[in-house]
Regions:
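Residues forming anionic-ligand binding surfaces in small-molecule and nucleic-acid pockets
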Residues: 38, 126-127, 204-205
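Soluble extramembrane domains of integral membrane proteins
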Residues: 70, 75-109, 113-115, 159-177
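Aromatic- and glycine-enriched beta-alpha-beta binding-site module
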Residues: 86-151
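Amphipathic alpha-helical coiled-coil segments
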Residues: 45, 49, 53, 143-146, ...
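N-terminal amphipathic/basic-hydrophobic helices that include classical n-h-c signal peptides
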Residues: 1-11
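Active-site acidic/histidine clusters and adjacent loop/turn architecture
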Residues: 27-85
């Protein structure tokens, strides 16, 4: 919380983390995605992107604890919840050195070093901001464990994904489904579309106005709470505490 002083009072105001300067920087980076430009604009990155993102991560610790004590908001500069702006170009033809978005990943404490683990995710990009959660591209044993849980507990899956508080806020990701039924499941299974998922994620769109509003911490915390039933189901399927 920020504060202002009125005669005889100290008034707490919601903190504003990001400004439109975040999106201005990222748009310009997309047009000038090279090391000399980034080096010349390093302080803008620090001021508009990294410092406010780390401040948000630090302040998310308490509301995240209210959702689950098994996920972490880690504000470390290296190895924490904020993804590096530098791209990994080792296995791609796209050699541009920088990402043109900011990403925050609040992972399960049992799998903190794994980007393919259950997590909350916040994506900030000009014209494409969203909050997401779930499990992205899990290894085959994890994916199979989730499919087995969906088939064994269809009512719990429906409660987690198709009812409030989840369903008014989130939409399940479409992803790139399997072409055929996964091993062990019949072609006429009533939940075949869900069983064929490669990713078990959900997302909700955010406007830039919401991201730059003073109440964004509370706004995003409410979004995390709405997604809790979905993450709870995934964690139980993987024998992870929630």
């Amino acid at each position: 919380m920020d504060s202002v002083t009125a005669p005889g009072y100290l008034v707490l105001m919601p903190t504003r983390y990001f400004t439109p300067g975040l999106f201005a920087f990222l748009r310009e980076l997309a047009d000038n995605n090279n090391r000399p430009w980034f080096k010349a604009n390093q302080e803008r990155y620090e001021e508009q992107v990294r410092r406010p993102a780390l401040a948000l991560i630090e302040d998310l610790a308490e509301p995240l604890l209210a959702v689950s004590r098994h996920f972490t908001a880690d504000p470390r500069l290296v190895g924490g919840s904020l993804f590096r702006i530098q791209r990994d170009t080792r296995f791609t033809r796209d050699r541009t050195p920088y990402k043109t978005h900011a990403g925050i990943h609040l992972r399960h404490v049992a799998t903190r070093e794994d980007v393919h683990a259950p997590a909350f995710y916040l994506h900030l990009e000009p014209g494409n901001c969203f909050a997401a959660l779930g499990l992205w591209k899990p290894a085959a044993p994890r994916a199979q464990a989730i499919r087995t849980a969906i088939a064994a507990r269809p009512d719990a899956w429906a409660r987690a994904t198709r009812r409030p508080p989840f369903s008014p806020v989130y939409a399940l990701g479409e992803g790139d489904p399997l072409r055929r039924p996964p091993p062990g499941f019949a072609p006429d299974h009533p939940l075949l579309d869900d069983l064929k998922r490669r990713d078990f994620t959900a997302s909700t769109r955010l406007t830039q106005a919401r991201v730059t509003a003073p109440g964004f911490l509370d706004d995003y915390a409410a979004t995390m709470r709405a997604g809790a039933p979905f993450l709870r189901f995934l964690c139980k399927a993987l024998d992870l505490a929630f």
